[in-house]
């Protein structure tokens, strides 16, 4: 029997559609940027996207060709938003450079990607000059300076839809892993549009962003497409609030209050700082418009989720993903029975990585076997879907990150409960293998973080002659607080088997972090495997 074909149009999924849609239907929706001097710049989607078309024309007039990489070295602001659309909608590839990386890494990344041009914030010019000579960059346009001159060379009405193939590259981002060279992930127009639809779907697993919302991406635009929020908000006509370089807690809280932010997204370290300020001055900021704060990048301590809700009436929604998954692949939402459950039960679920978004498929593997969904058995999380990378850019030596049947090996060790909620246990390189058993550093960290005296806690494996590895905790005390190692061990003891408890607890001034706010555990391992124990 012959199959019957559908009779629907073959309509390309490209970012040009989002641009035209926002200009046509949501032109008056606002885009607000906090400037370096703490003042505000206000514009709207219509004007910003007009300038994006102007940028697309100007890049072509400057001699750039289809597929050329245009880098940005910028904070979150409206000009960066213009590049998010003007570059890919002109047929070029947006390459966001992580301004927190070392110049040597930036030189490698810009060279490996083949960047021909860069748009850079004036304040970041000294950083650019440290590595530009080692790259193929030909053009430099400075925000608020030569960037504006570039735009004057073009008329936005000269822009013509380049009739892009939806599978053409739209953007690039390099991983910020703590081992090996950064690796390039190339997002297509299709994957970017589908990711925006998946993250923003008005269903229990999506964020449900609409025209009446105000979205604030605290997560940087220089990494993983700012979790897709610039595209999602533009697609839905939502107001956008960009914090610029002003990431101190007071500035962010002022932004949220003044602009009536309904959705905000950032890494746990950002929200820890905000929680501390809310605790110090409860009631100072009116955050009644806030629907939820999306947290990702590393596991969220259950204690933080409880503190925001109990003390301030604010909801934390955890998400999980990676640069390779565009980046959001799962989010937490509570089915009706769990939404009506007691607080402890709800917080247990909210502390998971949630359920996969539509079109993202997951499995948990130990060796060549699937791990049962019992909430106990652990294995490596593997994913596939339309916004999951199929390979790295020009890095054939990393092909082993994909299975023979096409799944991406995330490197995250997880368990799955019977309903499919993902519990991140550890990174495969960070799990502690003690006496043939696994200890989850993340679970011990989150338990320690519930202690009122601690601001941060990171747990690592250190070599042990008898057990192979044993856990060591590096902890940071809150200002004015005190605690002893024995007190901290006693605090978490009811939650774990005795052999899970850290043999050493080290008090440190700060925990080193990666460019995207994750703990740099490799630095801690180097420090504490070279030093004798100070506390035990």
Description of each model-found segment:
Residues 41-46, 170-197:
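Conserved AMP-binding A3 loop
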Residues 193-214, 222-262, 277-281:
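Conserved AMP-binding/adenylation subdomain of ANL enzymes
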Residues 345-350, 371, 386-411, 428-429, ...:
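Conserved ANL (AMP-binding/adenylate-forming) active-site segment centered on the GW(Y/F)…HTG consensus within
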Residues 355, 359-382, 418-419, 481-485, ...:
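Conserved beta-loop-beta connector loops within the AMP-binding
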Residues 27-29, 155-174, 181, 206-214:
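Conserved pre-ATP/AMP-binding loop-to-beta segment of ANL
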Residues 31-77, 81-85, 102-107:
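Conserved AMP-binding/adenylate-forming core of the ANL superfamily
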Residues 235, 258-266, 276-348, 361, ...:
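Gly/Ser/Thr-rich phosphate-binding loop
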């Amino acid at each position: 029997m012959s199959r019957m074909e559908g009779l629907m149009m073959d309509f390309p999924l490209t970012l040009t559609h989002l641009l035209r849609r926002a200009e046509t239907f949501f032109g008056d929706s606002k885009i607000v940027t906090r400037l370096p001097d703490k003042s505000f710049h206000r514009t709207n989607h219509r004007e910003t996207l007009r300038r994006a078309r102007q940028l697309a024309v100007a890049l072509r007039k400057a001699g750039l060709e289809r597929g050329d990489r245009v880098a940005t070295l910028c904070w979150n602001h409206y000009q960066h938003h213009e590049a998010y659309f003007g570059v890919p909608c002109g047929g070029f590839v947006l390459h966001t450079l992580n301004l927190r990386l070392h110049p040597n890494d930036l030189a490698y990344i810009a060279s490996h990607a083949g960047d021909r041009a860069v748009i850079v914030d004036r304040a970041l010019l000294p950083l650019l000059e440290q590595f530009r000579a080692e790259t193929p960059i030909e053009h430099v346009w400075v925000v608020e300076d030569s960037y504006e001159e570039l735009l004057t060379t073009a008329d936005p009405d000269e822009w013509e839809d380049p009739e892009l193939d939806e599978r053409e590259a739209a953007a690039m981002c390099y991983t910020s892993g703590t081992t090996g060279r950064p690796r390039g992930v190339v997002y297509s127009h299709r994957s970017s549009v589908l990711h925006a639809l998946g993250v923003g779907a008005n269903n229990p697993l999506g964020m449900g962003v609409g025209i009446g919302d105000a979205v604030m991406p605290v997560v940087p635009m220089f990494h993983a497409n700012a979790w897709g929020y610039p595209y999602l908000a533009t697609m839905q006509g939502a107001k956008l609030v960009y914090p610029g370089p002003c990431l101190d807690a007071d500035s962010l809280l002022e932004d949220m209050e003044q602009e009536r932010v309904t959705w905000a997204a950032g890494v746990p370290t950002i929200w820890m700082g905000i929680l501390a300020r809310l605790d110090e001055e409860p009631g100072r900021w009116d955050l009644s418009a806030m629907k939820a704060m999306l947290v990702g990048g590393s596991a969220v301590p259950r204690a933080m989720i409880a503190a925001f809700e109990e003390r301030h009436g604010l909801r934390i929604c955890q998400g999980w993903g990676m640069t390779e998954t565009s980046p959001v692949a799962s989010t937490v939402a509570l089915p009706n029975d769990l939404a009506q459950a007691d607080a402890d039960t709800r917080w247990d679920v909210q502390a998971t990585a949630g359920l996969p978004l539509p079109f993202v498929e997951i499995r948990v593997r130990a060796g060549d076997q699937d791990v049962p969904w019992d909430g106990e058995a652990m294995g490596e999380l593997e994913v596939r879907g339309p916004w999951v990378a199929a390979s790295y850019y020009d890095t054939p030596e990393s092909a082993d990150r994909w299975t023979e049947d096409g799944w991406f090996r995330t490197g995250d060790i997880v368990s799955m409960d019977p309903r499919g909620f993902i519990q991140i246990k550890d990174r495969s390189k960070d799990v502690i293998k003690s006496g043939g058993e696994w200890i989850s550093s993340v679970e011990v960290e989150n338990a320690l973080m519930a202690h009122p005296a601690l601001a941060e806690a990171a747990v690592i494996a250190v070599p042990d002659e008898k057990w192979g590895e044993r856990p060591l905790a590096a902890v940071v005390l809150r200002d004015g607080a005190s605690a002893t190692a024995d007190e901290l061990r006693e605090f978490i003891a009811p939650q774990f088997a005795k052999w899970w408890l850290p043999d050493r607890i080290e008090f440190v001034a700060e925990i080193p972090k990666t460019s995207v706010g994750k703990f740099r555990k490799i630095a801690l391992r180097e420090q504490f495997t070279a030093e004798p124990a100070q506390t035990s």
